[in-house]
Amino acid sequence: MATLRIGTLGAARITPPALIKPARSVEGVEVVAVAARDRARAEKFASKHGIRRVVDSYEALIADPDVDVIYNPLPNGLHGAWTVAALEAGKHVLCEKPFTANADEARAVAGVAESSGLVVMEAFHYRYHPVAQRMIDVVRSGEIGELTHVESAMCIPLPLPKDIRYRLDLAGGATMDTGCYAIHMNRMVAGAEPEVVSAKARIAKPGVDRWMQAQFRYPSGVTGTMTTALWSSTLLKVSVRAVGTLGELRVFNPTGPQMGYRMSVRVGGSKRRITVDGAKKATYAYQLEAFAAAVRDGAPVLTPPADAIANMTVIDAVYRAAGLPIREPSMRGT
């Protein structure tokens, strides 16, 4: 089996847990090169994480014949342009969430991906973990009855106003950064695409949300609530609640279950705790295994460009409903 050689764009904080660490445990995968705007930073990053080569520019990394896959953890507004550049150079792409700045850009990237025949995966790592599949299985099993409502939350403490996630020119904001997870989980559990009924935001700076809550309605009549924050009185909340006609499913920390999670079903007066085999294995390891299988064997991708379009469509609608601007792609030189 030939080694799948991965090059990473930038020296982002997410790269070690999301790519470098799992690559050490996934057979036939190696992170072989890194490129960053600041070569000194790239060299320090490469030395720290055992990456053999530092490449002078993003363009050079994408053109490198000894790289098969590009990992794209750049700021949100740069995801689309650099994913397209990588695809046009014949590289498979693992792109961090959110996939693009908006739904129109997602559709454009998806068109390039489809014509290329290459693997493109949006890095919703939690979706590849067995805890996510168990959530779906419980809801679809009918144990809690007919689904009526889904609540999802992704709130983290990020009080640093200079963090790039608060930059409108880089397509920042809570709904883009953490809300994309809460929206994705809501859609996953409901198994459908929602209409955004209403949304309200709290603002960090002009046009940029630090907190957002949205109300959804699905075609079946199921309702949904999504709450997300980078800074609010709810410092940390990562959860899903699915309500049915007979009971409810509650899950704590579905996006990082390897660090600890709780899953329970309550029906009538009884409560059942659910444990999931393989839960201690990292979401990122499952994701990288799935990506490698897609490249090598044509295995299905659970978070393909089509799913990214659907998620970005909801994100755009949430911003519209809250009276905030839809994000725009950043210039590649940003």
Predicted feature locations:
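Predominantly a Rossmann-like dinucleotide-binding segment in NAD(P)-dependent oxidoreductases
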Residues: 126-205, 325
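Contiguous beta-strand/loop segments that form the cofactor/metal-binding neighborhood of enzyme cores
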Residues: 184-257, 278, 285-298, 332-333
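N-terminal Rossmann-like dinucleotide-binding module
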Residues: 1-49
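C-terminal helix-rich "cap/oligomerization" subdomain common to oxidoreductases
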Residues: 1-3, 69-71, 219, 290-334
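Hydrophobic residues in well-ordered beta-strands that form the structural core
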Residues: 15, 55, 94-95, 120-122, ...
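Rossmann-fold dehydrogenase core element
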Residues: 108-126, 146-149
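Beta-loop-alpha module in the N-terminal Rossmann-like domain of NAD(P)-dependent dehydrogenases
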Residues: 49-111
